[in-house]
Amino acid sequence: MNINENYSGFTLNRIREVPDLKGKLYEFTHHKTNAKLNWIQTTDTNKTFSITFKTLPFDDTGVFHILEHSVLNGSKKYRTREPFVDLLKHSMQTFLNAMTYPDKTVYPVSSRNDKDFMNLMSVYMDAVFNPAIYENKNIFLQEGWRYEIHDEKEVPKFNGVVLNEMKGVFSDVYSNIFDEMFRQLYPSNSYQYVSGGDPKAIPDLTYEKFLETHKKFYHPSNARVILDGNVDIEAVLKFIDEEYFSHYEKGESFTIENQEVLPARTSTIEIEIAPEDSPENRSYISFGKILGHFYELKKKIAMSIVHSILVGTNEAPLKKAILESGLAQDVDYSLETELQQPFSILMLVNTEEEHLEKIKEVIRFVTKDYHFDPKELEASINGMEFHYREKSEPAGLLNSLHSLETWLYDGDPIDGIQLSSIFNELREEISTSYFEEMMKEFYDDEEHWVTVIAKPSKTIAKRRDEAEQARLLADQANWESARPYIEEQLALEAWQTTPDTKEQLDTMPKLSLSDVQSKVILFPTEEISYRGTRVLIHPSDPSGIVHFNLYFSLAGLPKDRLSEVAFFARQLLGNLATENYSLSALTSEIKNVIPVLSTGVTCFTPYNRTDGTQPFLEITASTLEKNVDQAIALVQEILFKTKFEKEFVLNLLKQSNESIRQSLVNSGHQYALLRAKAHTSAEGVFNEYTRGITYGAYLQSLEDHFEEDWEGFLEAIQNNISVIFSQDRFILSIAGIEKEKFEDFIFGLNTVKANGTVVHYPLLQDEKEALQISGGVSYTGVAAKMETYDPCFQVLAHLVTYDFLWTEVRVKNGAYGTGMRSNRLGFNTFSYRDPNPIVSLEVNQKIADYLRDFVKKPETENDLNIIGTIATMEPLMNYRSQVKTGDTLVLSSIDDHIRQAERERLLAMKKEDYLALADQVEEALKHRFQVVIGNEEAVSKLDGYKKLSIKE
């Protein structure tokens, strides 16, 4: 391709090398509309397409968020009710989603398959430019908001997918703080508004304004298209021009007015806590400030380094001073860089409003004359550069988003994907006062801080519900008649329950089974014995990064000790000082030597076993080949020489408990599933005791009784070290490292013998359990055991998720998310941010009948579900994930013959197979286990449920 030449209406303006991606950047402009299109040419066979619109909110109704959901519900060319879901069901997509940001809406897709890639791009282009929203108001009512009413005598309810999603978001402490920070930092431009929508304001959005907003902003002149990978660029340009851009004239483009940095001001908001929680020390105090402009990439990276060194660990100087003063339980920071004017936040967790001035005094004292250690700066830069260079997936999407960080605001699109020179510049600044100046720009500029104080309230949820109810009554009082709203609701339900016709289904692009790779992806792993140790050897990473995983069996450890070991492994190892390193020095050394280091627990269940599992403590590490010896030595230091000092352990414990509290509100479905699955398999029990509600209850009890339990806890930890880290329990996994490098490590382990590897944990027994949390929505988790495993259950679960549950739980019931999962241990279902958990649980009883009805559909429908299922089984993975997958297969005794046989079983599946599967599902659901995590109103409606609690 040649610069200044025209390609299907696009002029090629510039071609530049992108060495960091081993590729080139091609920049095009569409002549007729001035639309911008860039192609990041790489050898990546996973091809990515995204189209982005600059969408600038003008109120809190969440109109752009609702549009993001709505345009994917049918279009001029693709006439089914939900083409987005059809693609999830039937394509070979490796990424398929849409995202609303404070100033843009992004529609990305990717696929390894050329035909599929063009199909995905076509559906998305038609969705954004020719959506069915203009002819079908039901889409707005379903995805946005509506009055739900069936009888003139009843009080209506608000319902809608986005409305319920945002009720869940508004239950999150951090979301509330960030929304208020946006309001206070940017009072003069569009960033002041909640782009996702405030639940109080969403019902203010009219259908007419919704359509008007789409017409105004969804135009090629306001679009940025990015392609990434080994794309047939001329075919793509021809398609985009002929099918879409050529039909438009030049339209409006939009700019964001820069916000003047204003004098300091303080705002107070309320955050919800559970009725049984004490409000003492449950406030949050956050300081925020605008930091320059989007094009100051060096400053953004430098500020991240400054924050990391000052508050990144409990022994970082500023965080340590605040913790030791007792002014807060935790200190965190955030950099919001995907904005025209980035900003930074320093957040103090679990504090009191009255501590505000003392906190400022501590910040002044620590930062006034602080000078950064050159070695610590070097380590931080090295660590950040390692993460930048290590390929993450989905790489094409990440490249696109990084490029948009500058390009969206008419900056240079190459800046966000070519950062090597910036890391070199930062190294040169180590010997100057640059980092101290960056510190002062934020920490010593109180006169421009926005301070947000979030105070706990036990009544805000009740007041919020009462306000919504009062509004509904007021709205109803102003109606001349309820009949139009009842008819609107009935029409919506009729549309939701009407299956797509054959004519509608035929409009969707389709693949055939012949397009699917019949062979499974292999993860070559050689298993040998070295110095009496089981060693798994993987091929070297082409990038030159080396990886090692260490596994120590936890067999023989009583079930009641699992939570203790999980806390020890996940929160203490690597987060405490050691005999030879202070925590700050250890953190610096980790960044320098092992930029990727994680410690925790995991388990591997032998093939076709549910009664037992193999539990392990695991250490995962990635580094450069030149640092291998230092990395191994550092891991030894962490495992055997960590100093378990009472005060520092307590700080980590409190922070862990706060994290779990927030996770229960934000991701309650994960905890519901963990609990439910603990009733069906030994693996489920292990995960519940190491990550679930039981784990949370253990940590809370340990904090509540810390003084009296400390000596016993410390003794148990020391005993764990002497028992767990033994040669007999050790398995080594390596990629790109000689096994001999670990000889000293192996001989440094103790010689305590282990008894077996498979553990049979007793299953939980209660069929129905519930946990009450604060928040506006609820979550469910259901688990059931299968007598025999058939790989076809994977297809069944895929179908049920994207057809039956999507329609019944998300579309009709208004839950933000739902799904069914199946593996060798059984199957489970869940709902997420669910306004009516009882309804969602009842839906499960209809799965078997739905499957029997599915048999009446054409065989091609079954083929499409097989295609979609296989796509989900082969996600994009970076090399580190490939190594971990290889370990999992070996340690679960699943060889390539088993995997290939299962693939062939899937490809041979016929729709009649659903009849036998339906019978098994129906029988299994008779003995299901249900868990609900929800607010007070939802839990109070449950009958026959055992009440759970994190607290004693």
Predicted regions and their residues:
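Non-catalytic terminal extensions that flank enzyme cores
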Residues: M1-T48
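Active-site recognition of the HExxH zinc-binding catalytic motif
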Residues: T61-N73, L562, A566-R570
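Non-catalytic, conformational "gating/processing" segments within enzyme and secreted inhibitor domains
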Residues: N159, L211-E243, R691-G692, F713-I746
